[in-house]
Amino acid sequence: MPWIQLRLNATSENAEAIGDELVESGAVSVTFQDSHDTPIFEPLPGETRLWGDTDVIGLYDAETDMSIIVAMLENTAVLGKGFVHKIEQLEDKDWEREWMDNFHPMRFGERLWICPSWREVPDPNAVNVMLDPGLAFGTGTHPTTSLCLQWLDGLDLAGKTVIDFGCGSGILAIAALKLGAAKAIGIDIDPQAIQASRDNAQRNGVADALTLYLAKDQPDNLSADVVVANILAGPLRELAPIISTLPRQGGHLGLSGVLATQADGVAQAYQEQFTLDPVAEKEEWCRITGVKK
């Protein structure tokens, strides 16, 4: 069936309140969309992260009288009289199929592919990780995840132990295992990430080789041949005393989730204990790698 879409602009401070009003007015769904294609990262547990300039979009049945809806919304404190909005008629589509059509297998480095489950793998002889796009955790589309996957693909991981610090979907740990690592350890602050990583590892047949910890429960004596942390610049700096202890002597460290403009600040937190490589960049993002001294 066709739909009517009501779109209006908001800030991160009032977007949720506006969304609540759209639901109260009869919207069958409400979504939040970045107005300016600004990167945003996975929220902390219990936190909703929105863009500073956010479009709030309400979807209504095609038979809805939108003049009545607008009049109702004008009487709310968060919007008021004459609020700016746009109303559009949406044609009937198979929205799930259209969403699925946007995702294709992606290649990282020489051997590694990340493939949605509904697509055929391009190369059955390659290293294929089956991972479906989700709302919360990484699937390889972000430049920082891509940089980390390419780095892992270029390492000799045979028989190695890998720690994925801030594992999210588990994509990096799972990729490392598929690339030959003997064991992987995933650490995250979010229980949902732990569950997502466990589910994705089972889907890829590597669950027995993946150990998962909430950050508050991780053992004190963890160490690995390779450590990768794709989080944010602030946490990478703050957690440097912890992350720096994880690679064994001669082990590899890979850090991302960092804007190129933040690279020097992050590198300074690690340069005493690691021999750092030249920074790799993709779009405005970067990856910092090095070897434990």
Swiss-Prot record:
Q: Does the keyword S-adenosyl-L-methionine apply?
A: yes
- Record key words, sorted: Cytoplasm, Methyltransferase, S-adenosyl-L-methionine, Transferase
The record's similarity note reads:
Belongs to the methyltransferase superfamily. PrmA family.
> Per the record, GO CC terms?
cytosol
CDD domains the UniProt entry points to: AdoMet_MTases
Catalysed reaction equations from the record:
L-lysyl-[protein] + 3 S-adenosyl-L-methionine = N(6),N(6),N(6)-trimethyl-L-lysyl-[protein] + 3 S-adenosyl-L-homocysteine + 3 H(+)
Q: What is this protein called?
A: Ribosomal protein L11 methyltransferase
